Design a protein with these regions (language model features):
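A juxtamembrane structural motif centered on a specific transmembrane helix
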Residues: 1-9, 178, 340-342, 375-389
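Hydrophobic transmembrane alpha-helices and their immediate junctions
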Residues: 53, 182-186, 213-222, 231-232, ...
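Alpha-helical transmembrane segments of multi-pass inner-membrane proteins
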Residues: 111-142, 153-223, 328-332, 336-339, ...
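Aromatic-anchored transmembrane helix interface
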Residues: 57-67, 76-100, 112, 116, ...
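N-terminal signal-anchor transmembrane segment
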Residues: 1-47, 61-73, 127, 354
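Long extracytoplasmic/lumenal interhelical loops at the membrane interface
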Residues: 138-140, 263-318
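A membrane-periplasm/extracellular boundary helix in multi-pass inner-membrane enzymes
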Residues: 220-266, 283-288
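Hydrophobic, aromatic-rich transmembrane alpha-helices
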Residues: 15-18, 34-47, 167-178, 320-340, ...
Length: 389
């Protein structure tokens, strides 16, 4: 029987938040409400070290400076996005500290949290398959499938669900390389998560996934060449088989040809021109305010269209000051990811994929991005890899 004490309760609340970070079709989500309610308790009981204060400063200082400067110079006030930014920045550092604190309580806490994400990813994909099979794209007021036949799951956008499934897919893909135990189960998990990524029909998510998979393949090619060769050949065979089946299939979902829809996603879309034009306006914002930018959440005030590029959005809204501090943060997290040893190379692979994804989609407000950041920083400081003696 589990003995309930303060530490145990905090541990299960962390797992609960992780689960609900994959169910975000309404805002604030259950996880958001949980974090906000517990924030006063976290502030009182959680102790920050120099690393946490430094990370928070790199995020909060340019955000607050640009917010006040945007109001003083342009009259822009966007409290909503400032609060969202601050919430996610606090989530990042508190999640990191909580992981540090629970290392002795659960030496496999990364696995525990990833299995939690895997469970909610399965829920998303299974619900999507149910929608495809029954034609019920809307379940209890939530569009599970939309934008044609793109899988949204319990997210608000397939471009967010796809990258979330990528992290889970990379986790189980690394399991595929790590041992001969439960190999069939690992292949099934990988195939199912890959199906979720594919059905999102997000081109950025596909590129994200490819970059992450390639990184893991290269890492394990140096770790165990014999295992690498046959498992990589098996992977290539399965992927080629899947693609051939897709090309020659003639499935129709809700009157839409699956094959034709897939082909359509491979080309340049009409709205891509709007995206490129919007991205070019980031230079206009820099011209308006080079140092501090125009303020968080104000990009659309100038363009009337989302940036679809996290780096250009950050630069336009926070100026060169934000670009420098943001660059330092990304560089720090990347260096920590490259220090990872042991059995969690998927974290570095996920980071690479997310950084690639960020060039094509606004990722700043993705909860799973900040949780991955927290996992990387926390795990990379461990003297002994989680779950290894």
């Amino acid at each position: 029987m589990v003995k309930l004490n303060s530490r145990t309760i905090q541990y299960y609340l962390l797992i609960l938040y992780t689960f609900f970070s994959g169910v975000v079709f309404f805002e604030p989500s259950v996880g958001d409400i949980l974090f906000i309610v517990l924030l006063p308790i976290l502030i009182i009981h959680v102790k920050f070290k120099k690393t946490e204060f430094s990370l928070l400063a790199l995020l909060l200082v340019p955000t607050l400076f640009s917010f006040f400067w945007g109001f003083v110079k342009f009259g822009f006030l966007n409290f909503k996005f400032v609060f969202i930014d601050i919430y996610l920045f606090l989530l990042f550092v508190f999640f990191k500290v909580c992981l540090d604190n629970f290392y002795e309580y659960d030496r496999n806490i990364i696995d525990t949290l990833m299995k939690t994400w895997l469970a909610v990813a399965y829920l998303n994909v299974f619900t999507g398959l149910f929608s495809y099979a029954t034609g019920r794209f809307n379940i209890m007021g939530q569009s599970i499938v939309g934008f044609g036949i793109r899988l949204i799951g319990f997210f608000k956008d397939p471009n967010v669900f796809g990258p979330f499934a990528c992290v889970c897919g990379l986790y189980v893909f690394e399991k595929f390389y790590q041992s001969n135990k439960n190999l069939i189960f690992a292949i099934f998990n990988f195939g199912f998560m890959s199906l979720g990524v594919f059905l999102s029909f997000s081109r950025a998510a596909w590129l994200n996934y490819f970059a992450g998979l390639l990184f893991i393949v290269l890492v394990y090619s140096f770790k165990n060449k014999n295992m690498y060769k046959w498992r990589t050949l098996l992977l290539v065979f399965l992927l080629v088989f899947f693609m051939v089946m897709l090309i020659f299939s003639d499935i129709t979902i809700a009157g839409i040809s699956f094959k034709e829809f897939f082909k359509g996603r491979l080309g340049i879309k009409s709205y891509d021109a709007q995206r490129f034009a919007s991205q070019g306006k980031s230079l206009v914002m820099l011209d308006m305010s080079k140092i501090f930018g125009i303020g968080p959440g104000n990009y659309e005030r100038i363009t009337n269209y989302s940036a679809h590029n996290t780096y250009l959005r950050y630069m336009g809204e926070r100026g060169f000051f934000g670009l420098i501090t943001g660059g330092l943060l990304v560089a720090f997290i990347t260096l920590r990811a490259l220090k990872i040893k042991g059995k969690y190379f998927f974290l570095a692979a996920s980071l690479i994929g997310l950084l690639v994804n960020s060039y094509f989609v606004d990722t700043l407000h993705w909860r799973h991005l900040w949780i991955v950041f927290a996992m990387i920083v926390s795990y990379s400081y461990r003297k002994e890899p989680y779950g290894e003696s």
